[in-house]
Amino acid sequence: MIVSRCRDIEEFKKVHAQCENDRIPSAESILALGDYCFCFYSKDTGKLLGCIYLEDDNGRVCLSGFSVRKNYDIVIRAIKLISDIFHEDDLYSLTDKKSAIMVLLRCGFKKIDDETYLRKAF
């Protein structure tokens, strides 16, 4: 897995459009986050597998993202990498998606209410 900035906006928009989650902002809004938008690519093919981004949510650092289907292990590795980079911040994530919840729990996030998960700073 390779993590970097967006390499191809059209590819980014295509993967973003395949996402079935109304909570995800527009592709343009995510790309506008600049240094807080991390794309992850296949080491073998160079294709975009997904994106993790950080936003401010009323003073909380909120981690969100999207990916192509059936790449749980890669998504977990990507989230752990980004979480380690921002280890001095409490990271929150808001979701009701079972697949996202499974990934967050495997990355050390804890459920703190119905749809909110937290990974404490370390």
Model region roles, listed by residue range:
Residues 1-25:
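Short amphipathic alpha-helix that is part of the acyltransferase structural core
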Residues 39, 46-55, 60-64:
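Conserved beta-strand in the GNAT
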Residues 96-114:
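Conserved active-site alpha-helix within GNAT-family acetyltransferase domains
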Residues 114-122:
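STAS-like cytosolic regulatory interaction modules
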Residues 68-85:
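Conserved acetyl-CoA-binding loop-helix of GNAT-fold acetyltransferases
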Residues 1-2, 35, 108-110:
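Short glycine-aromatic motifs
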Residues 28-48:
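A short helix-loop-beta-strand connector motif used in the catalytic cores of GNAT acetyltransferases and
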Residues 85-96:
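Conserved GNAT acetyl-CoA-binding A-motif
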